[in-house]
């Protein structure tokens, strides 16, 4: 018995891919041909699968609240018309129906009429899905059946065959048509060669012949026009920059990781080449003094100045005194002298109002639809089905705008209006305790507000006039009940001493931390600058200093004959110089000293030098001088220099002489690489001189190499920056040379034509004379011929007359 296959069932991933490829090849109208590739699916199922799931235009994202509201409203307007509702929402009909049933189930579950576990949409074991076209595809098994493999191979072969029977037939027909055209053309050529002209008379078509004419042709105007703007530059794409990573760009994490890696490599190289510099850089980074300074707190200017505050206080004090003087004056006095300084209802609890509750429109609409679906027959009568009120005025629901209550309009320190949160009008005053008993009270007791602001509070002009008249009558009645005036005056003197004493009191405010830090940093910087000025000039200018102190420059004190006063002064200067050098070695080491301390080979020797200098400095400490003493010493030295200069008649030393002396002194100093120290050139041997010169040559070569590398980098950078300008400069230079050649050629031509013009001007009179002579000669010749002609004519006439006689 043959195997019977019922088409349908769950769609698999392989079938979906075959269906996509078939739609790409055959289009969306040949579903029978597409279904022939799928043995288990019919044409109708393939079409439904495409339009319900595989179409790229299908929206498969989560349903939004607006879409749910729109779906429920349209379902209430057009029940069961899912094909009509689907394009309005932007979903498929199956998606709309499934979502609609889900919302109804949710509404029933909300009311408690249905168990959440009892969902009819869930398939039970053994049931078949009635709509498999709207479900995701099932993944392919690892071991596929033979019929599935056969179907896959056949579909792959058919879809890969772009030269089928139809394509071959079309190619063959095209070749036959071309051969037929060539044969007809050859026949017409042979007949034309034989003298038989057979022209093809084409039948005139009604309308426009698109093969012979150009529809909507707009012929250009006659003349020459500049078309250089139409010459587009040749597009030369840089394929290296068209890669995906260049188009998308790098992520920020990748860039940060690369920069960190570069920083690590740079720091590693710096530690290998310049360890002291790296240590100093790390110490500088870890130094809290170099932390980024916080910006100063800038507050806005006060809206009320101190003078205005004083005026307000004085006005309040005056009003309080006036109220105290008429404290027992009655109700009329209280109404006239209302207290404007205190806003009513200031002691109410300050509480932020809550946002109004939001209604669940989707749930309400679902419950309305459930209620309508469960309505009994209207023949029984009774009340209508209770439903929630919906606010739909069209196809789409109206959005519920939720606004946060304005606290500024309902705070107790603002003027209260008709309701809490109402915007106060311009010129309003506080509501007093006593008001006119009417529909709307007049809060302007001292006629401060303008009339327009008062008139705006009433609905009509008549009501405003009536209210004003009532207020006027009440005011007149209150004035009539006033007591007799008393001539008691109280003068209050300003308390200037108290204010003056208060001005001298320190202001009780908390200083900003940023200002404190800034002042501390400024003070620290000032102290560092003062300390730097007290150091030696070699440290201040960062000049090279010796790594050890040579005490052999001192002379022994117990010598015969004893030292003179000048020599003793010189020894004191040397001694002070040695103390200063030791202090600089310990407290202000150079980069070479730091490098020797970090180097394992020279660490012990450098540490021993520092220890010895520290011990010597403890025995003979350096004396600290004040700034005044240092400045006075500098002044004494300057005066002594000026005195010696004037007595010795020395002039100012020119720069050339100074440079010459400096070069001579510098030539006497020689660096010994083997001993790592400087010495005089006269005291060094020939071998030491050669080593020193070799070392200097090596340093010069190294410096030259570094300069060459820097120059190459700068040249490369400038080539990148100025390459386009250089190319343009070459082009402009070539254009300039061409223009210069054209100018020279034009000048030569102009000179030639000028010479030719001069020659022509000289030859014109001669030519005119020659032409005049020719004309005169021709005129005379014509006269002679005319005379001869007249004679011959006369002779002919005479002969004819004789013949007639």
Curated annotation (Swiss-Prot):
It is found in: Nucleus; Cytoplasm. GO terms for molecular function: DNA-binding transcription factor activity, RNA polymerase II-specific; RNA binding; RNA polymerase II transcription regulatory region sequence-specific DNA binding. Keywords: Cell cycle, Coiled coil, Cytoplasm, DNA damage, DNA repair, DNA-binding, mRNA processing, mRNA splicing, Nucleus, Repeat, RNA-binding, Spliceosome. Residues 108-143, 246-293, 409-442, 530-556 are annotated as: Disordered. Residues 108-127, 246-274 have a biased composition (Basic and acidic residues). Disulfide bonds: none annotated. Residues 31-54, 82-104 bind DNA. Residues 1-58, 59-108 form the HTH myb-type domain. DNA-binding protein involved in cell cycle control. May act as a transcription activator. Plays a role in pre-mRNA splicing as core component of precatalytic, catalytic and postcatalytic spliceosomal complexes. May also play a role in the response to DNA damage (DDR). This is Cell division cycle 5-related protein. It comes from Nematostella vectensis (Starlet sea anemone).
